[in-house]
């Protein structure tokens, strides 16, 4: 509980907001108050090219989204520090982290959340849209 309501943690970079982000946030809002763990610029650079917008610009946009109640800085892809600090009842993350390099991050997040009875919710990604595809189009000059 955070301010008397179930807290739902949603990590994201939110460099290019698209319908998939909105869908994830709407799903998260069904479980409680949404707290976005917005990746810092440094955290994004660990796994993606330079963000188009800096942290403060992205924060302004994310704070304006209807389902979002709180925005906090996510310093790395290691969710444990923020999970321990805020102790959400739920964390919402797309299914892409079940395999590959993020599978260990996922396992750790599940273990940490379980310490206080928290759960991970993994909705399907929105078909036909992704930040990576949109960025490739922008960088390539094709729309």
Feature roles, as predicted:
Residues 1-143:
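Nucleotidyltransferase catalytic core that binds NTPs
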């Amino acid at each position: 509980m955070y301010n008397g309501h179930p807290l739902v943690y949603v990590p994201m970079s939110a460099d290019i907001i698209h319908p998939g982000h909105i869908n994830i946030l709407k799903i998260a809002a069904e479980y409680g108050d949404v707290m976005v763990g917005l990746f810092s610029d440094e955290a994004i650079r660990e796994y993606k090219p330079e963000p188009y917008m800096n942290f403060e610009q992205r924060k302004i946009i994310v704070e304006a989204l209807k389902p979002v109640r709180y925005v906090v800085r996510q310093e790395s892809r290691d969710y444990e520090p923020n999970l321990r600090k805020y102790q959400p009842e739920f964390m919402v993350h797309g299914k892409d982290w079940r395999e590959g390099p993020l599978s260990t991050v996922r396992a750790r997040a599940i273990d940490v959340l379980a310490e206080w009875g928290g759960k991970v919710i993994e909705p399907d990604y929105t078909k036909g849209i992704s930040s990576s595809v949109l960025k490739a189009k922008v960088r390539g000059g094709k729309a």
